[in-house]
Amino acid sequence: YKLLVNLGINSITAIGHQPAKILKSAHMKEICRSILNDGLQVAQSEGIHFPDQTLDDIMKIYQGYPDEMGTSMYYDVLNQQPLEVEAIQGYIYQKARFHKLNTPYLDTVYTFLKAYHLKFTRN
């Protein structure tokens, strides 16, 4: 569950370069829901079944965050630091590939965050 919570908010705040207030935008909120939906699809394929209201529950958690609350990935981007992309988005992305799932939002955020992260490695 925590990995899903981190998947949505960390992806949006890091790519959008904004703290939690980024979810005040209806468009960003919908993108976040789509990222979470991809994550839920992966979890289900892994045999992890969440209640139907899980996506709404996670979005309610985000609504409770203060506008200026940043995530670890947001602060990593802000401070020009490497990201924990493989531990969050990368892990879920690899599971999606294993199950041959169509996860376009997850694929996109993983690709962008991985590209940012690669500037800190020699590979």
Which residues fall in each region the model found?
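Active-site-proximal catalytic alpha-helix in oxidoreductases
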Residues: Y1-L40, P66-D67
